[in-house]
């Protein structure tokens, strides 16, 4: 892995951070599902309720996702974790929805060329949620641009890191989902540590093959 820490070290760090917090994350997930499941039921209806449910899903899911990222960031920083952090994403409602829609749009557009460019773009933008959570003054487009910068040269690293959870995913299936109580936060903390790891590194000199022809805002001095 072309980074300061190996995959094994990043995952070991995540396990240590998760120690004593498994049930806290379980509670956070229960709250999230308690909000999203009723909304998903609305989308299955065949009347106006389905439209309301669909709108609610697109309005509620992005800020909740951002709030979850904030919870994981707090844990990796060693900060006290509060359930209320889960709802801090709603303070950035507009930006979280904008980030979700821009990501969806760009990935769909690149997927129209071929599937592979769309997959590559999804990895380019995969750190945007973390960036927006840590930089609330950024716009959604700026977070996407910053994600492209720090993921340049690290997309394969992230893919391999995700692949390293294959057997954990099998364990979830074998245990009928019970193992997810541990595996899910362990995986997400690992990905959060990956973000911390690559954001400290200078961007590689090589340019990406694909780039949007729009948005020309300068990218100097954006890497910590």
Q: Model-derived features: where do they sit?
A:
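Hydrophobic alpha-helical membrane segments
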Residues: 1-224
